Amino acid sequence: MVEVEHWNTLRLRIYIGENDRWEGKPLYKAIVEKLREMGIAGATVYRGIYGFGKKSRIHSSDVLRLSTDLPIVIEVVDRGHNIEKAVNVIKPMIKDGMITVEPTIVLWVGSKEEIKKFEEDAIAERR
């Protein structure tokens, strides 16, 4: 049985296009680099193989329908206050996209030292 404790963690998702840019570099790279500089717990970039956005135009990795602007999703899970800071920094970088934030429960997988540090930080955060 797994014990679940609320650690005030949030999941941030950033939906952008593969061709979106920030200061001459791919936007997804600029965002991940900024998150890393901020000390965010981690970020993962997913490249969509098929989808559409608000303009209802299909984007596909299919050879017969090769799109040069596939959907990109950047996903981050961290403590609530870190996600809030990240959103405030990233929002001005996005000209055409979407940001979502939702509560999530972390069932931590890691070393005992990492888990203990995470728990201590979460307890201190509640005070």
Swiss-Prot record:
Annotated InterPro entries: N-reg_PII-like_a/b, N-reg_PII/ATP_PRibTrfase_C, UPF0166
Origin: domain of life: Archaea
Gene3D superfamilies in UniProt: 3.30.70.120
UniProt xrefs under PANTHER family: UPF0166 PROTEIN TM_0021
Similarity annotation: Belongs to the UPF0166 family.
The protein's name: UPF0166 protein PYRAB06660
Species classification: Archaea, Methanobacteriati, Methanobacteriota, Thermococci, Thermococcales
